[in-house]
């Protein structure tokens, strides 16, 4: 809806801005026909004499505008006639030779070569791309670079006024054509005309039909189509596409809409016209398709084109199709026949790949498997296509029978075709080099993604009924072992592709993601701030990340905040979900009678319910109430109430007995997603992956906590439809030396703090009232106090944050289960 509203607003402003030129064109046509346009204000002889000085200047201006319009029309007409002549007199082979002779791209099909040659011969040879040195090519109303910025990215440079070389066109001697020689002779000494793409049509060669009630009149859209080179037809027969309002599909559709569905004619939103005109380039019809999912056999809408809420519903409910390295893909239909992944000489023949190139509008995946079914029948399963759009994918199952060697050869051939790399060096040694426009392997591990192996919603009751743990512990284990929290986490980050096991990747793949992040961190500091080079830099970063960790909605990230929110935070969450997958395993695929108890044992962690009348419970409740501020989502404000509290003692963490011997101990809040909790309980808190100069990562490789429950709630808040989450209370020793920071520390400062492993306090704009702080037990300070303004009014942090660089100085003490509730909610009594 936001997209639609913006487009309409822009279209309205364009329509108003075009009013004057439309009038001038009418006047020009009347004058061309020999008729003088009638004046609205007829002048007397006296008036004419009085205005005698002004009239010539007005006439001169009108004539200049008329001449300019006629000149543009003449240039377009001359080019059109030249194109017809070129196609008549030159062969495709001649055109290729002329392009090569002028250092232009001569590759591609006839449809690519012909317009390229016409442009070069009439307007002059194009200079190379100023960003990457590639070849420019006219596409729509812009010249786009066809080169590559790196192996990860196509060049994104585009312009409507490209630089061209001077001098005559070079025609190779073996092009024997009198027409070309004669035409070149005529052009000697003349300058090349300048190509004005705005005068040419976006919709050139297209016949378009309009259907049903639209947001604007049919007359408006008809004018836009015809003004940009297209034609409008009243019938659906023979048209390129039918344009309709998105509301048509919900209202049953008009006659034209229904007829288009029957004929298989594309039906697109009116925004296709608006956006094509706005962007000065014909947009792909598939991206504006509003009818495919109406037809039962239709292609369906890509997940990336759905409303984000609809996409979330689709992916949350979707069955995970590929759960790990040994899992048979669901779409092959061979699992039900007893199929399993073929393995020979230590190689498991199951590969997944992806590639994202935003400049080339590419976001694809590929799956290849050799599947053995009973009676030694070997099948090759192959799937390749756009991520989130199964109906557009190329997909096949090929039965090789007992021809095992042939199946392996075909698998290896496809691997090399898809990636440009050899198969065995990758599988045996993980040697791989990304090739331009080729896919990159998603290194799956031998296990089961928690979205498949975890407890499904309908299985929760049975799992809890068989659990021998204390009911209060069963409750939390049921939450942490369910599929739901991990599905939601991946959905919120956009990494919920059903075809790919993002929750079962190798440590090597995750390490590559971390190394990539660290490289970017260094490169960003010296990256250009604006211009084509900056665009290319950020596009390459985005392409690389969304190739390593695929999504249905890739976009170009820019700035430290987006790297922190999407890359750093995303990597940490995917890493922790992978740990959960290994801990939980395949709950109901195993023979375990009590999977929840088994997972609890693997944690190596003691979890016990804190009773409500205990001193610890009362202390924590007071600490939360004092340091919490409501979370605001849109216009709704949410408060947090304590549901239950658990005391935690983990064998992986420093014990409380060890921590209590350390200096400057503080009980602090830590916010985390529920999907990250199993990792924290098993391994303790892990320092942030790197230093990024934004809150959350500004202290570098540190464990960051706060004295404000409000700060932790910002990380722990889930969603309005999932109001339950967990906050963590940990005892942290800040060491003997504590440094206070009021601003954003620089790279050198962070490096020094990491090396010294000192305790750091980042002073927020709000702080807890020191007069209310108290000591808990064994000298542990509880900074519990009302949130008040601090003296650091211009600091980057809203609340105080504490950074600890040594994981041995932090121990999780409590898990606080909270429920977020809407404040000031009006309750309507039953009548």
Swiss-Prot record:
InterPro entries tied to this protein: ARTD/PARP (IPR050800), BRCT_dom (IPR001357), BRCT_dom_sf (IPR036420), PARP1-like_PADR1_N (IPR049296), PARP1-like_PADR1_Zn_ribbon (IPR012982), Poly(ADP-ribose)pol_cat_dom (IPR012317), Poly(ADP-ribose)pol_reg_dom (IPR004102), Poly(ADP-ribose)pol_reg_dom_sf (IPR036616)
Transmembrane residue ranges: none
Ranges where the record places region Disordered: 1-69
All residue ranges annotated as the PADR1 zinc-binding domain in the record: 49-199
Domain BRCT: 200-290
Gene3D superfamilies: 3.90.228.10, 3.90.640.80, BRCT domain (3.40.50.10190), Poly(ADP-ribose) polymerase, regulatory domain (1.20.142.10)
Record: residues binding Zn(2+): 129, 132, 145, 155
Domain WGR residues, every copy: 338-439
Expression induction or repression: Induced by heavy ion irradiation.
Domain PARP catalytic residue range list: 594-827
Region (Zinc ribbon): 124-168
Protein name: Protein ADP-ribosyltransferase PARP3
Biological source species: Oryza sativa subsp. japonica
GN (gene name): PARP3
């Amino acid at each position: 809806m936001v997209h639609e509203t913006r487009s309409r607003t822009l279209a309205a402003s364009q329509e108003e801005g075009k009013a004057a030129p439309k009038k001038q064109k009418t006047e020009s046509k009347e004058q061309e026909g020999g008729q003088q346009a009638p004046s609205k204000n007829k002048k007397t002889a006296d008036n004419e004499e009085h205005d005698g000085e002004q009239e010539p200047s007005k006439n001169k201006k009108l004539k200049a505008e008329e001449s300019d319009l006629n000149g543009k029309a003449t240039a377009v007409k001359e080019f059109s006639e030249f194109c017809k002549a070129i196609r008549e007199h030159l062969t495709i082979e001649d055109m290729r030779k002329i392009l090569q002779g002028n250092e232009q791209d001569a590759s591609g099909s006839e449809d690519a070569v012909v317009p390229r040659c016409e442009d070069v011969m009439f307007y002059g040879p194009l200079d190379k791309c100023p960003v990457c040195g590639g070849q420019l090519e006219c596409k729509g109303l812009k010249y786009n670079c066809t080169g590559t910025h790196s192996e990860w990215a196509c060049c994104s440079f585009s312009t409507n006024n490209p630089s061209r070389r001077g001098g005559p066109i070079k025609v190779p001697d073996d092009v024997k054509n009198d027409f070309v020689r004669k035409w070149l002779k005529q052009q000697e000494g003349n300058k090349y005309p300048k190509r004005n793409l705005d005068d040419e049509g976006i919709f050139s060669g297209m016949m378009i039909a309009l259907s049903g009630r639209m947001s604007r009149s049919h007359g408006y859209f008809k004018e836009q189509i015809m003004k940009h080179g297209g034609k409008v037809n009243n019938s659906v027969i023979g048209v390129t596409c039918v344009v309709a309002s998105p509301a048509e599909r919900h209202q049953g559709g008009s006659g034209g809409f229904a007829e288009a569905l029957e004929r298989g004619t594309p039906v697109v939103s009116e925004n296709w016209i608006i956006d094509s005109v706005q962007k000065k380039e014909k947009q792909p019809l598939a991206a504006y398709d509003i009818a495919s999912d109406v037809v039962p056999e239709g292609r369906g809408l890509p997940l990336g084109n759905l409303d984000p809420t609809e996409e979330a519903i689709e992916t949350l409910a979707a069955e995970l199709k590929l759960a790990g390295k040994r899992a048979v893909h669901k779409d092959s239909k061979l699992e039900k026949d007893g199929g399993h992944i073929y393995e020979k000489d230590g190689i498991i023949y199951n590969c997944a790949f992806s590639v994202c190139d935003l400049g080339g509008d590419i976001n694809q995946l590929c799956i290849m498997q050799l599947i053995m079914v009973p009676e030694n029948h070997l099948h090759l399963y192959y799937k390749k296509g756009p991520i989130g759009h199964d109906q557009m994918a190329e997909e096949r199952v090929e039965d090789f029978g007992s021809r095992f060697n042939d199946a392996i050869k075909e698998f290896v051939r496809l691997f090399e075709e898809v990636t440009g790399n050899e198969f065995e060096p990758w599988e045996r040694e993980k040697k791989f080099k990304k090739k331009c426009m080729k896919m990159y392997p998603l290194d799956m591990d031998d296990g089961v993604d928690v979205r498949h192996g975890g407890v499904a919603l309908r299985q929760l009751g049975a799992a809890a009924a068989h659990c021998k743990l204390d009911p209060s512990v069963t409750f939390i284990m049921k939450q942490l072992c369910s599929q739901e929290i991990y599905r939601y986490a991946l959905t919120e980050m956009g990494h919920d592709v059903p075809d790919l096991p993002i929750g079962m990747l190798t440590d090597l793949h995750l390490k590559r993601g971390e190394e990539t992040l660290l490289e970017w961190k260094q490169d960003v500091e010296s990256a250009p701030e604006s211009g084509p080079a900056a665009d290319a830099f950020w596009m390459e970063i985005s392409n690389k990340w969304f190739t390593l960790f695929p999504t249905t909605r890739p976009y170009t990230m820019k700035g430290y905040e987006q790297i922190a929110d999407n890359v750093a935070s995303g990597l940490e969450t995917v890493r922790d979900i992978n740990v959960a997958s290994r801990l939980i395993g395949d709950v109901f695929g195993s023979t375990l009678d009590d999977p929840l108890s088994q997972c609890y044992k693997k944690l190596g962690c003691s979890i016990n319910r804190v009773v409500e009348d205990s001193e610890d419970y009362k202390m924590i409740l007071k600490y939360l109430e004092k340091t919490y501020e409501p979370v605001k989502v849109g216009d709704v404000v949410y408060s947090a109430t304590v549901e239950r509290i658990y005391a935690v003692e983990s064998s992986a963490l420093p014990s409380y007995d060890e921590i209590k011997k350390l200096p400057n101990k503080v009980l602090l809040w830590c916010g985390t997603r529920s999907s990250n909790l199993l990792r924290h309980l098993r391994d303790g808190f892990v320092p942030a992956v790197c230093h990024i100069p934004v809150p959350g990562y500004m202290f570098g490789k540190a464990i960051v906590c706060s004295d404000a429950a409000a700060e932790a709630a910002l990380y722990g808040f889930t969603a309005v439809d999932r109001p339950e989450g967990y906050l963590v209370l940990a005892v942290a020793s800040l060491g003997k030396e504590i440094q206070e920071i009021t601003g954003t520390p620089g790279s050198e400062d962070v490096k020094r703090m990491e090396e010294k492993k000192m305790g750091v306090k980042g002073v927020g704009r709000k702080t807890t009232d020191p007069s209310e702080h108290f000591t808990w037990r064994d000298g542990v300070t509880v900074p519990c106090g009302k949130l008040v303004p601090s003296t650091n009014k211009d600091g980057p942090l809203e609340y105080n944050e504490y950074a600890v660089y040594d994981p041995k100085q932090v121990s999780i003490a409590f898990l606080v289960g909270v429920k977020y509730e809407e404040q000031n909610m009006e309750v309507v009594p039953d009548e």
